[in-house]
Amino acid sequence: MNNDNTEVLENYPQDGLQSNSHIIWKGIQSRLHKFYGNAIYDSWLSVLLYVSTESGKVLLSAPTRFIKEWILVHYLDQILKYWQDEDQSICSVDICVVSNQDPNLLVDIKDRVDRGIKGNCDNVSSPLDPRFTFDNFVVGKPNELAFAAARRVAESNSPISGSNPLFLYGGVGLGKTHLMHAIAWYIIKSCSKRKIAYLSAEKFMYQYVTALRSKDIMLFKEQFRSVDILMVDDVQFISGKDSTQEEFFHTFNALIDQNKQLVISADRSPSDLDGVEERIKSRLGWGLVADINETTFELRLGILQLKVEKMGINIPNKVLEFLAKNIKSNIRELEGALNKVVAHSSLVGCSITLDTASDILSDLLRANHKSVTLECIQKKVAEFFNIKVSDMYSTRRLRTLARPRQIAMYLSKKLTQKSLPEIGKSFGGRDHATVIHAVKQIEKLMDTDSKLRDDINLLNRMLR
């Protein structure tokens, strides 16, 4: 039986290994590599495999549905163009998702992308995401320790004193899984003989229960205790599951005794894992505990810039800044917002601007909506122009202070229900006439000063 992410190839005719179409495809791959560069080709296009050609229709395969859909949106037109350059009878190119267990496959996809697991660990490991590598991980203050520790584990041929286990913890979507996949990919690509097993704690529990029911518990133990590196994601899942905790405890001890490396992740520190036995929490804290903190604006912007670069598309930096300042919950949601904007632009055929991004993400932004207060406006404007909040109340008339103050008054008038006297009072006891003057001054300048207009539009979106 195939899973939901697999499309069966039985109905597709497949060419012989040495067919002319295979030769054409190799040439097209070279052209795609040259056209898009290493980053995009390695991340997306290198995993495409040629399947068949029939009645002017070319069929390629991708290892996952996500990769298939991304290529269909962003790169299919260029692939079709190159095919038609070689064969004018080609009218379309389609992509299917294949199973790494299908006997008709022309290459072993397991060794390419979909599995990425070595040795006899295939039955216990989960697939690795080809996007999750060290090169694709943006490092900043919130995650630099976790990144350095993960990289060190990957580069070392044996467990490092003080880093076994490596315990990564942080909120949802902050990069824990990315780093665990990156460790595995680094080892795989370095042609190391080390055996790796990566899986979630939920899958560990499921396989343990299955082994108990089928009376294969010794095989289960052998599989997990024969690895060189065991990586268990979201270990908080075993909370309250006594028998699973018992087996995890013994597996942990067995691997440590054999001088094998463990990498564990959770959404909280070992000491905060409620429902997990004290002896397990103690062992999880034996090595290096590295937290991944909430992202900063600079880190979020860097993540977006790297993602856009790998997509091979141009998006105005103001749009990226808008996303980075408004989508703060986690990296997964941030990247999802960018994907939504890019997909909408590609499908509808519109350019990406602040207005279109705001419209496309209106639901997401509304979900994060907070009531706008005068204090919030003053703080945001001060932060935007790199001045002190106290400058909003001061009597200093320096242009670098007066203009942001006027902008804050303008936004206060537009975004709140406060009266002019109330607004004036919040800006150091100024009267309503001062507020009216500020509003009119900003409105006048916005007609002629495009940069000021853009800044105010961006602030407007950030505050809503």
Curated annotation (Swiss-Prot):
Chain positions recorded as ATP binding sites: 173, 175-177
UniProt comment concerning the protein's domains: Domain I is involved in oligomerization and binding regulators, domain II is flexibile and of varying length in different bacteria, domain III forms the AAA+ region, while domain IV binds dsDNA.
UniProt record, GO biological process: DNA replication initiation; regulation of DNA replication
Region (Domain III, AAA+ region): 127-345
Domain of life of the native organism: Bacteria
Stored InterPro entries: AAA+_ATPase, Chromosome_initiator_DnaA, Chromosome_initiator_DnaA-like, Chromosome_initiator_DnaA_CS, DnaA_C, DnaA_dom, DnaA_N_dom, DnaA_N_sf
UniProt keyword annotations, A-Z: ATP-binding, Cytoplasm, DNA replication, DNA-binding, Lipid-binding, Nucleotide-binding
Protein name in UniProt: Chromosomal replication initiator protein DnaA
GO cellular component: cytoplasm; plasma membrane
Keyword Cytoplasm in record: yes
Region listing for Domain IV, binds dsDNA, in residue ranges: 346-464
GO molecular function terms listed in the Swiss-Prot or TrEMBL record: ATP binding; ATP hydrolysis activity; DNA replication origin binding; lipid binding
Subunit structure: Oligomerizes as a right-handed, spiral filament on DNA at oriC.
Region (Domain II): 90-126
Region: Domain I, interacts with DnaA modulators, residue numbers: 1-90
Subcellular location: Cytoplasm
PROSITE patterns attached to this UniProt entry: DNAA
Family membership noted in the UniProt record: Belongs to the DnaA family.
Function: Plays an essential role in the initiation and regulation of chromosomal replication. ATP-DnaA binds to the origin of replication (oriC) to initiate formation of the DNA replication initiation complex once per cell cycle. Binds the DnaA box (a 9 base pair repeat at the origin) and separates the double-stranded (ds)DNA. Forms a right-handed helical filament on oriC DNA; dsDNA binds to the exterior of the filament while single-stranded (ss)DNA is stabiized in the filament's interior.
CDD domains linked: AAA, Bac_DnaA_C
